[in-house]
């Protein structure tokens, strides 16, 4: 694959990162083999912009950052999915090979793609000893690669294909506190 990234930072106040990845896979048919997935991430440290927030006299509210990101992630098919299941047949006296026609792959199988985004805030209190991180996220996965049972009249029993979408979202909250913090030891 090929990966590229561009980063920008303005005096530690704002940051932006844009990435792109182009992958080729041998586990999908040639026309669906290449796929691209990008991402963008950014953040703004508001505490650097608000007068008095980083003042050493104001240690009860010491840091505030807003952040967000969006990304796509690709996933290809498992290895050997398109081989027709030839294998050794050990019960024949001289060995041999067998063909197992009970498994099929949809020939229009495409990569599974997930798209996600997240927004969050990072707040620190009491000279950074108490930290609160709150984020909301959403993930949508399309073209899931699954193996399903099909009617025997199709000529096989199982087929792998792109089937369905899944969406999930939620809130993540993290609260951390430094109980003891000195030059020799930190207990969080």
Residue ranges, per PLM feature:
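Extracellular/periplasmic, surface-exposed regions of secreted and cell-surface proteins
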Residues: 1-188
